[in-house]
Every structure is written in structure tokens, then in C-alpha cells.
Amino acid sequence: MTLRTKDGLTLYTRRWDVESPRAVICLVHGLGEHSGRYEHVARFFNENGISFAAFDLRGHGRSEGKRGHAEYQQLMDDITLFLQSLDYDCPKILYGHSMGGNLALNYILRYDPDIAGGIISAPFLALPKELPKHLFFILKLLNVVAPSIQLSNGIDPNLISRDREVVEAYVSDPLVHDKISPRFILQSLEAGKWALENADRLRKPILLIHGTADQITSYRASQEFAKRAGELCKFVSYEGFYHEPHNEPEKERVLADMLKWIEG
């Protein structure tokens, strides 16, 4: 199944369905990756009576669009399109990882959508280390003269997981890319900052998870968001985990925590 965006792009979607699901998890994946990397997550939830639906973000995976480039508002609109396409008569849970965590969290805060809640994994609310001033200046300049130019996203595959098989599969995956545009990185950083500043606008329950050894997105920013959001945000910290909790050697523990939260 595919979706057609307002500006004419085709978005690729996937569904892992069970009969009479008690809930459906709606995935927004991270930067440079694609929804196919979550098949094991989908299968886990299927085994527990929960359907799983996903789409490849524009410029990612099997979807159309320039690799690594999008206007932030376009992605918000694409999430709306995706959610509206789902014909389930059961609670929806928005699940976003990394950049997808940034998008999902902003979507929940800005739109208060008709969902039961959200699972937010290692969201890109800020970088672990502040961007050097000269690089920030260059990005702002490029945003004016060449906003969609493809730059390297700087993600070190060795930092996504402590599981070498996961890293090797990521590196060899032809649908994974390492691109990002000046416009998208600046808009995403601004959106992460906005989410932190507006955490008290949270009106839906969320499970926020993050590994303490994440060197790709800021663990401290997640801590701060949880503190500001209050009781609707349950924060679960994983000591020593890298960027992708669902792909760590202890992933069964992470998935069990997600399921427990859903059932609670």
C-alpha cells in the first residue's frame, strides 16, 4: 500500500496485522533508516495481539523524495496522512524513534491527536554535544543559499547498538542512507528545542525511553523533557545502552517494558 502526499510524492507503507487487535502501534522511524528495520519489533507485538503499522518517511527507504531532505511541516502533514489512512477500530499508539521521536513528540504536543498515547525512543531533542558555532554558522548560510543540498548526517553506525550484527546489517542495508540537508537539520533542532520548552503542553500519556550511553541523541534532553512534562510522561532509563534500545542485546527487556506500559 502507498500514500500520496499533498505535493505529489508516493510514500511506502507496511502493516503487520493480527486478527481483532487490541491496539495498533504506528511507527515513525529515524533519520536515514526505514520501517523495514522494525520487523522484529512488529512481530513481537503481533505475538501479543497488537498490530503494527509503519511508513517510510519522504526521502527515506522506499518512499519518494530527495534523500535526507524535507520541510519539517511536510513531515507533520505526512504523519497526519498516515494516521488518517489507518482503518483500525482499536486504540492507536504513536511510536517514534530518534528523529522519528522528535517528529512524534512534536506531533503529540502540537496537534493533540486522536491516539491513546505515544512511545518515544531516544528522541532527537538535542545533540549530545552542542554544535560548534562555526558549523552552526555554515548551516545557517547554506540554509539560505542551498537549503536542500545533501550533507552527511554524521551518524557513526558503530554507535547505534552494542550488537555487532545490528551494526553490520545497518551498514550493508541498501535502503539506509547517511544524508541530511541544512534546512532539515536546522528545523529539527528548532523543533527539539520547542518540544523541550513546551513539555508542559503534553495531554497524552507517553513512555519515554533512552539509553544512558547514547552518543547520537541527548539522553539529558530526554531527562529534562520528562521532568518538565510531569506525570503523563513515564521515563525509563537503560544503563549503558546505545542509541537503539530496540536493537540492543537486551532488546527483549525493552520490548517487554513497552508492552507492560501499553497493558498498564
What are the functions of these language-model segments?
Residues L232-G264:
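Catalytic active-site module of serine/aspartate enzymes centered on a nucleophile-bearing elbow/loop
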Residues H97-S181:
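Alpha/beta-hydrolase-fold enzymes
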